Amino acid sequence: MSWYAYCIAERNSFPELCRHRRPMPLTGVTGLFGNQIFLFPASELAVIVSEHSAEDSARMDQGAAKDHARVIAECFKLSTVLPFRFGTTFPDDDALRRSVRSNQRHFTANVERLRGKAEMHLKVVVDDICAHTGLHRDFTVGQHYLTNLRESAMRQRERQSKARALSVQMHRMFLPLAEEITCKRMESGKMLLDIAHLIDHKTVERYQNKYSSATHELKDCQMQLSGPWPPYHFVHRNSPAA
């Protein structure tokens, strides 16, 4: 039987597994395509899975990706979770057990590190200070090319400097345990900072209050907050399957 894997969780979070060594149904949560969710015991861990067929593989789309995230979010309400990538499957019980066994120490360490933690996600949009600095002069083709190169390099440095300053400001405001930040220029000419913060789950309300304060302090920024989420950005994977 082929298994579709959603995430790894702590076995002791599920009373259904206390007296069983075989996969047990998890009630109240449905998987991809309405398939039954099972708790697959593996030492001190449990793998959240559902049965998977060749027909299911042909139906993997954006809706299935949303269902994948939904199942992980539901399990996150019950346990620390280590999410699998969308589309992770195992051909049979033995393959699943081997994968968990070979990564046991890594998975266990991550569960310990992320227990009681949650991820908050911030999107911050600001005007790009470099968006309208183009100069209009009479240059030869060669001069124009070199000038464009210099201006492009200057704009990139200024953009990076502004992104660093803003990310430092965000760090000081929210004081996360860890963070992952990406920055890119949008088609509109504005700059987008995509920020993932790892925090203690018990401080979510405090974090939300800080967000409310930040939206009033940073008038030149458009901010959007989501979470708490499973710690997607903070699970360090060392194998293709997990």
Predicted regions and their residues:
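An interfacial alpha-helical scaffold signature
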Residues: M1-A242
